[in-house]
Curated annotation (Swiss-Prot):
Signal peptide range: none
Protein name as catalogued: Probable histone H2A variant 2
Gene3D superfamilies (alphabetical): Histone, subunit A
Subunit: The nucleosome is a histone octamer containing two molecules each of H2A, H2B, H3 and H4 assembled in one H3-H4 heterotetramer and two H2A-H2B heterodimers. The octamer wraps approximately 147 bp of DNA.
Primary localisation category: nucleus
GO molecular function annotation: DNA binding; protein heterodimerization activity; structural constituent of chromatin
Pfam families tied to this protein: Histone (PF00125), Histone_H2A_C (PF16211)
Length: 136
């Protein structure tokens, strides 16, 4: 019977230690800050789980990788659009600047083939339409 008393005493000590640990709670760190990126890893992970057909099973690193790719592409497009707006001496990036930036870059143009609302058209005059100056 002495064995039971010892186990009860040990259980009381562990519950007291667990209660003490709960009172000193660590501050939660987001997965985005752990990965060193700005895009929300948790939100992207949730959205990936909603779209996958394998019973919502998505690896933890898949969301981090996807978020970092999206952040890189966004930074690339914004940098090119900012350069386009700076060339036109305007402080605000418009859909026209996005259009000029995306269509000006060959790789982004192949990636983003859709129409950008309010983007206008890319200025281009075909060679055959240009008047040729002839010397007489």
């Amino acid at each position: 019977m002495a064995g039971k008393g010892g186990k009860g005493l040990l259980a009381a000590k562990t519950t007291a230690a667990a209660a003490n640990k709960d009172s000193v709670k660590k501050k939660s760190i987001s997965r985005s800050s752990r990965a060193g990126i700005q895009f929300p890893v948790g939100r992207i992970h949730r959205q990936l789980k909603q779209r996958v057909s394998a019973h919502g099973r998505v690896g933890a690193t898949a969301a981090v990788y996807t978020a970092s790719i999206l952040e890189y592409l966004t930074a690339e497009v914004l940098e090119l659009a900012g350069n386009a707006s700076k060339d036109l001496k305007v402080k605000r990036i418009t859909p026209r600047h996005l259009q000029l930036a995306i269509r000006g870059d060959e790789e982004l143009d192949t990636l983003i083939k859709g129409t950008i609302a309010g983007g206008g058209v890319i200025p281009h005059i075909h060679k055959s339409l240009v008047n040729k100056v002839t010397k007489d």
